[in-house]
């Protein structure tokens, strides 16, 4: 009799876990909460974005006639990161950091702005994005260290460079995190555009819109998973 009870309890627990995973992996919430780079829902935009899709189209034709040099570095934890460099005849440099789910080339309008002001341009695919390695998007937690590495790369190659660091959305949060570090004197300015102050609050707000996810306290479970698999918590 007790064996039957144990089997029933175990079955219920397994079912509960399966439902939890399904909700994270199949619902609209997944797009907002996933940190996996190849997730199916990461390719799906929100209903609002889809409704106004013309506003979000990105024309990449500006890059076609530009002498872009592809460069790469190794991150502190051994990932190969892909960067793109546009040279100008000046000591002014702009490091441009993209946001969640984007790629370096999609920062075209910001790159264009700096380039037309005669800045050398370094933009790159964040870890877990584009042509850079990494299975996980770290919401700035490790990315700001990558910014440090890219800047060290520039300074080593161009000792007299004067650097402006610009970040958008998750990139904005990343450069904010970088701003709290001990920076080389070459870094003259940091610009953060529409950053979040807390990735935990952003994801928690989305999760709480689902009754089931709010009941099972998604963020507590999610942070346990992140700490175990990736080494940090939101």
Regions found by a protein language model. Name each.
Residues 111-133:
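Conserved alpha/beta-hydrolase
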Residues 137-158:
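Alpha/beta-hydrolase active-site loop
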Residues 158-169:
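Alpha/beta-hydrolase fold nucleophile elbow
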Residues 177-234:
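Hydrolase active-site cap/lid region
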């Amino acid at each position: 009799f007790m064996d039957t009870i144990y089997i029933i309890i175990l079955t219920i627990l397994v079912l509960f876990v399966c439902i939890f995973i399904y909700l994270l992996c199949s619902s609209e919430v997944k797009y907002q909460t996933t940190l996996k780079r190849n997730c199916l829902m990461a390719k799906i935009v929100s209903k609002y974005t889809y409704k106004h899709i013309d506003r979000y189209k990105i024309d990449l034709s500006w890059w076609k006639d530009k002498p872009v040099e592809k460069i790469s570095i190794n991150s502190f934890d051994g990932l190969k990161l892909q960067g793109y460099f546009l040279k100008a005849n000046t000591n002014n440099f702009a490091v441009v950091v993209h946001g969640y789910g984007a790629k370096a080339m999609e920062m075209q309008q910001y790159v264009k702005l700096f380039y037309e002001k005669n800045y050398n341009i370094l933009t790159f695919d964040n870890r877990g994005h584009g042509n850079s390695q990494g299975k996980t998007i770290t919401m700035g937690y490790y990315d700001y260290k990558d910014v440090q590495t890219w800047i060290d790369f520039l300074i080593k190659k161009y000792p007299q460079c004067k650097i402006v660091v610009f970040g958008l959305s998750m990139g904005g949060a990343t450069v904010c995190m970088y701003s709290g570090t001990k920076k080389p004197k070459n870094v003259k300015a940091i610009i953060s555009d529409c950053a979040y102050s807390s990735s935990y609050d952003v994801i928690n707000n989305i999760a709480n819109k689902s009754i089931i996810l709010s009941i099972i306290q998604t963020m507590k479970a999610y942070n346990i998973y992140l700490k175990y698999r990736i080494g940090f918590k939101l």
